[in-house]
Amino acid sequence: MKALSKLKAEEGIWMTDVPEPEVGHNDLLIKIRKTAICGTDVHIYNWDEWSQKTIPVPMVVGHEYVGEVVGIGQEVRGFKIGDRVSGEGHITCGHCRNCRAGRTHLCRNTIGVGVNRPGCFAEYLVIPAFNAFKIPDNISDDLASIFDPFGNAVHTALSFDLVGEDVLVSGAGPIGVMAAAVAKHVGARNVVITDVNEYRLELARKMGVTRAVNVAKENLNDVMAELGMTEGFDVGLEMSGAPPAFRSMLDTMNHGGRIAMLGIPPSDMSIDWTKVIFKGLFIKGIYGREMFETWYKMAALIQSGLDLSPIITHRFGIDDFQKGFDAMRSGQSGKVVLSWD
């Protein structure tokens, strides 16, 4: 079958022909319809330090997808041939303390689809049936293909009560923009997003944020004054991993503010911890999606009117995958969707 693989320990992704995967007793075989390119896939393409330490070569990559069930393991219940599904990319062990307590998103033995085992950039994918999620009929293939990153956004945004709150989102990448849209949709008062990439800030404006701020040109304190905010932000969603953005967030949080961190900063990032202590800030680390509460909330948010369509900016057939990666690597894109039909 046709697949996109990391074939060599160097920059690039290559179109290859690989055997179709075998279906185990508890697995589903999924015929892929559409996939989306993640920032993780760009890291793998670039072959950065993280990728060199993490990715086995050769391997089929990718973990954002929608497809159709075409094969079912003999122990599987609850799925049928023809079901349209996406799937949780974190495959968990089922036997650690967190798994047994129902906190599977915190499994210490997680294996990543397209990171530690073959991924979805292929005509067919096998995953455990436990990881599959049925897509409602009124959600398009395009939107279903980005459920994985949308789940990161939903998990982060809904970590705290947002109704009537002033929310600061640092980082206007696709996940940050979707998190900002979720915050506005569920009833936040002001949703302010910051970045230095004007293309992506414009995407955030299309998604309905209160203010999209280019911090290279505007002062965040001036924006707060313009919005009538006198006590700082109630909730911070840190999506950038950029130390200056996180320090600015700490400066502008209200006392007792709550911060959810999805962005991955450098390991040696320094901050003024006195601001955390004397402001009484609560900081929560976010990884992946809650299984599967986040997935049900994702579907419900779209069904209740949340419009994510502006975040998908580029669409290509799979034979033009290089154009998709070029768009993602340029920084001048939202989500990029590849069609396998």
Swiss-Prot record:
Q: What class of enzyme is it?
A: oxidoreductase
Q: In which pathway does it act?
A: Amino-acid degradation; L-threonine degradation via oxydo-reductase pathway; glycine from L-threonine: step 1/2
Where it sits in the cell: the answer is: Cytoplasm
Q: Which PROSITE patterns match?
A: ADH_ZINC
> Which Pfam family, giving just one, matches this sequence?
ADH_zinc_N
Q: Give an example GO cellular component term for this record.
A: cytoplasm
**Under the GO molecular function aspect, what terms does this record hold?**
L-threonine 3-dehydrogenase activity; zinc ion binding
**Any one Gene Ontology BP term:** L-threonine catabolic process to glycine
Q: How is the cofactor bound?
A: Binds 2 Zn(2+) ions per subunit.
Cofactor names from the entry are:
Zn(2+)
Which keywords accompany this UniProt record? Cytoplasm, Metal-binding, NAD, Oxidoreductase, Zinc
Q: What EC number is given for this enzyme?
A: 1.1.1.103
Q: Which positions are annotated as binding Zn(2+) 2?
A: C93, C96, C99, C107
Q: Where is this site: Important for catalytic activity for the proton relay mechanism but does not participate directly in the coordination of zinc atom?
A: D148
Residues the record lists as binding Zn(2+) 1: C38, H63, E64
| Biological role stated in the UniProt entry | Catalyzes the NAD(+)-dependent oxidation of L-threonine to 2-amino-3-ketobutyrate.
HAMAP family in the cross-refs: Thr_dehydrog (MF_00627)
The record describes its quaternary structure and partners as: Homotetramer.
Q: Which family does it belong to?
A: Belongs to the zinc-containing alcohol dehydrogenase family.
Name assigned to this protein: L-threonine 3-dehydrogenase
Q: Which organism is it from?
A: Klebsiella pneumoniae subsp. pneumoniae (strain ATCC 700721 / MGH 78578)
Provide the organism lineage as a comma list.
Bacteria, Pseudomonadati, Pseudomonadota, Gammaproteobacteria, Enterobacterales
Q: Which gene encodes it?
A: tdh
